[in-house]
Amino acid sequence: MANKIQRSSHIYSFCIADALAVMSVDLGSESMKIAIVKPGVPMEIVLNKESQRKTPVTVALKENERLFGDSAMGMSIKNPKIALRYFQDLLGKHIDNPQVTLYRWRFPQHELVKDERRQTVIFKLSHEMQYSPEEILAMVLNYSRGLAEEFAEQPVKDAVITVPVYFNQAERRAVLHAAQMADLKVLQLINDNTAVALNYGVFRRKDINATVQNIMFYDMGAGNTVCTIVTYQTVKTKDSGTQPQLQIRGVGFDRTLGGLEMEYRLRDYLVKLFNKQQPSKDVRQNLRAMAKLLKEANRLKTILSANADHVAQIEGLLDDVDFKAKVSRQEFEDLCSDLFQRVPGPVLQALSSAEMNLDEIDQVILVGGATRVPKVQEVLLKAVDKDELGKNINADEAAAMGAVYQAAALSKAFKVKPFIVRDAAIFPIQVEFTREVEEEDKSKSLKHNKRILFQRMAPYPQRKVITFNRYTDDFEFCVNYGDLAFLSQDDLQAFGSLNLTTVKLRGVGDSFRKHLDYESKGIKAHFNMDESGVLSLDRVESVFETVVEDKPEEESTLTSKYTVLLPKYIWVARNSVLTPPPPTGPFTVLFIF
C-alpha cells in the first residue's frame, strides 16, 4: 500500500491547507466504492467495517435499527422484505414508469405505493415505515460518509458523487436531494463514465500530447451498460499553459443490460431444476428460498466466467431440502443468448452520437464487473473489430478514483495538476412557445416555435440565453427535452415526461408600459447547465435601449442599454417528473420577487 501512495503522490502535487478531507462515492447499482483525499494521503479507497474495498448498496430497515452493507445483505436472505436493493432505478420515476414495473417483477417482496403528492414511488414496509427512494439513498450516503470519516479520522462534508450518464434532470435532482438530506455538500455530480475517463487520463498524463487519441470505454456493470468514446489531447489555456484535456465525444447505453439480468436468468434456471427434482414443492412461493437462489446465481455467474462448469449447491433451500445441480458455461450462455446479442448496441450508439467510425478508435478498454463474462468479451471483440480488448484499468475502482481526483480539484484545500474535462449532455433540451401571428389576409393565428437550448452532446458547464423579441405582454414558455429519436422505445418509455417545466412570465406588460420611450431589445431568459449537468433558470429580464445625446462637450451620440429585471413570474411544473422540494419543480429559480 505504501508503494501505491508514493506512486500517486508523484503524479499529483497537492498543496495541503488547513481544511477537511474530501470524498467520492461511486454509486453502482449493486455496490459502492468510496475514496478520500486528505492531508498526507493523496488518494485512497476507503475500507469498510469488514475491511472490504466495496460495499453493497443495500439497506435493511428494522423497527428500531438500520443495517447497511454486508449486514444488510445478510438480511436479504433472512428477511427479504426489509432489505432494499437496486433502488436507484426508481429515483425520479412516476409510479407508472416501466422501470417501476420491472422492479416489482424483480423484487416482488417489496410493496411499492404511490406518493399521492408527487405521483412517485414509496417503499411501504409497514404503516409507520414508508420511505421514498431518495430517503433510502440519503441513508446510504450518510453511511458512506461515516465510513469515510472513520477511515480518514476526521470530519468529511464535501463529496463528488457519480451518477449514470443517462440520468436525466429529475434523476440528477433526486440524487442531489438525497445528498442534501444526508447533510453532504455535493461539489459535483460526475457521470461515472467521465470519472473513469478522468482516472485513465490522469495516470497517463505523460502519454497525452497534441496528437488526438480516441479511446472507447465499454462499461458493463451489475445494472446497466454504457459505452463512451473519449478524445484525449493537450490544449493551450490562457491561465495555465498547455494542459491535457478529455472530451466526451459519444455515448451509448442500455439501462437494463448487466450482470443482474444474467443472474436472474440463472436463478430461474435453478428454480426449474429444483422444482424438477422436487415436483411436490414450488420454490417460487418462498421468498427466502428465492433470495438464496439469486445469491447462488451471482456466485455461479462469477465462477462460470473462469470455469467450464460448476455445481450449484444450497443447503436447506426449502423445507430442509438441499439443492445441488451442475451447470455448464454453455448452458449459462444459452440462457443469456438474447442479452449477449445486445452487447454491440451501446457501441453503435456511441459511434453514431460521436459521428465517428471504428477505424478512428485507437483502443477499447473494459470497465465494470460484468465485462469479465467471457461471452461478453467475445461478442464485444467482434463488434469493435479490434485485435484485443484493453484490460489495463481497475474495472471496479476507476470511477471512484477519478471522482475523488475531481473532488480534490474542486476543493480549496488541495492543489492538483490541471486536467481539463469537457463533458457532454446526451439529451437535447429546447424551449417551446406559442405566439400570435398575422396572416396575409390580416387574420390571426397561433404559431408554435422551438428554440434549441442544448443540442445532443452539447458540452457543459455552459450558459445559454434565449431572447424573445416579439412579446410585449405576459406570456409563457415550456422547457422540454428535444428530439429523442435516438432512444429505443423501451428507453423512451422509461425516460418519463418530456416536459421539464412551464414558465409563466408576469410583469412583461408593465415593464413595456413604463419604458415607452425606449427601444426593446427583447426579453432574455438566462439558463445555466452546471458542472453536475443540472439545468437552472437563473433570471429573466427585459432589455431596453435608448439614444443619449451629449452635445456640449463631445458632440457625440451614445447608445445606452437599460436592463429591467421582470418583477415577477410564476413558475408552473406542468407534467413535471419528480423534483425535490424546494423548489417544487425542475428549475432552481434564483430570482428575487
Residue ranges and their predicted role:
Residues 57, 119-121:
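A generic secondary-structure signal marking the coil-to-beta-strand transition
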Residues 2-7, 11-102, 126-130, 139, ...:
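Oxyanion-binding/catalytic loops of NTP- or PPi-dependent enzymes
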Residues 107-114, 465:
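Short amphipathic beta-strand and strand-loop transition segments with alternating hydrophobic
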Residues 132-134:
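Hydrophobic alpha-helical hairpins/lids featuring a short glycine-rich hinge
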Residues 62, 111-119, 127:
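Short, ordered beta-strand-loop transition motifs
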Residues 106-110, 144-147:
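Short, charged beta->alpha transition segments
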